[in-house]
Structure formats: structure tokens, C-alpha cells
Amino acid sequence: FIETGWFITDLGSTNGTYVSGHPVDRAPLRDGDLVKVGATIFKFLSTENIEAAFHEEIYRLAIIDGLTQVYNRRYLEEFLDREMSRCRRHGRPMCLIIFDIDNFKQINDQFGHLSGDYVLRSIADKLNRRIRREELLARYGGDEFVVILPETDLDDAIKFGEIIREGIEILPLSFDGWKIPVTVSLGVGRYNHKMTQSSELIASADSALYRAKANGRNQVSN
């Protein structure tokens, strides 16, 4: 019969050839097999596997913010449109929190732009661990972040906003030996059935964020 696929053949080598830990004279190769030749180990990947991994990485780069490694604005808008459609169909609640770092420009000016990047990454990393599977954390731009909370009413969203605010306020941040005190202001917006565009919900939360800043910063407003 005709053999198909990929095979490896040992041509009488001194040290032998091993596939996934087993010595072989001739053996078929399966995707992910580890091939040991002498002191060198190779991982066999099929062309289809490499191509799929390539496309997955390209897609990941398109939806993930490079600095903070959370979702970017593009994916945020796609996700929010889907969730608003679901809320309209099923009459479910949803809230959105938008927040930014208080006096972020002063952090950059006093400690340098690298410290600002460090602060953004640290905050994103801390919050990403608190986000549930059905929720979303995204960098909206600059030092602004958005949290989308499906199946969440206003009271619970405000409580979660307070958890974010308190957690960041006590976050021990230091860069190049300098301690960096950081607080955030947060605005909470609630979806209602009259909203037809995702920009309306974002604008509602953004107005609340403006009030939080106008009232002294380091607080949650709605």
C-alpha cells in the first residue's frame, strides 16, 4: 500500500532517533511529536497547524492592546455592540464603567514616561485578574479604561467601581526606587432600552466620569 503523511527514518545513526521518547527505525510523525536526534530535540508541526497559529496570532494582535495586554478599543466596540443587542432582545441589564488615572500627566512629568507605562500595565494586570469570563476590560485610549458588566444592575456596578477604586489606591507601585501614589476616578453608565448606539452608553459613563473628577477625583459617580 502507499504510505501517506510524514515519516522519519533512522539511517543507522550512532545515538538513535526517538519520537516522543520512544526509539524508532521508521515512524509516522503526528502533529506535536517531539523528535530527538542526538542531543537535539525538534517539535514537529504540520503546515496546517503553523498556518492556524499564525492566523490566531494575527487576530490576537488586532484585538489586544500592545502595552497593557488587555483588549483594545476596536474589540471593546465589537463586544459592546453584541452585548447591547443581547440586552435589547432579552431585556437584560448591563452597565459600563469608564475610568482614568488621576493626574496621569503629572506622573509622567515627575517620574518619566516609562513610569507611566509601568502604571498602566500594573493597573491592567491587577484588574484583569478580577474580571469574570463574561465581562470585559479594555484600554479605551491613553490612560482610560473601560469595564463592561453584562447582567449587572447599577447598584452592583457602583459597588464594583468602589472595589476598583480602593484596590488601585492601595496598589503598591514603585518605579526606579520611587513610590508612585495612584488614584482613579470612575464613571458608571447603565444601559436602557432607549439606547440604540453603543456610543450612547459610553457617553453616559463618560459624563459620570466628568462629575467624579469635578467633585474632587478618586471617587465613583453615576
Which residue stretches match the model-derived regions?
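Catalytic-core segments of nucleotide cyclases and related cyclic-nucleotide turnover enzymes
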Residues: L154-I158, Y191-S221
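Conserved metal-coordinating catalytic motifs of nucleotidyl cyclase and c-di-GMP turnover enzymes
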Residues: T68, I97-D100, G142, A205
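Conserved nucleotide-binding and Mg2+-coordinating catalytic segments in signaling enzymes
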Residues: I58-E78, F99-G112, R121
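Active-site-proximal alpha-helical element of nucleotidyl cyclase-like catalytic domains
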Residues: S115-L136, E144, I163, I168
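Active-site-proximal structural segments of metal-dependent nucleotidyl cyclase/transferase enzymes
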Residues: F79-F111, L127, A138
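Signal-transducing coiled-coil linker helices
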Residues: D10-T17, H22-L67, R74-R86, E135-L136, ...
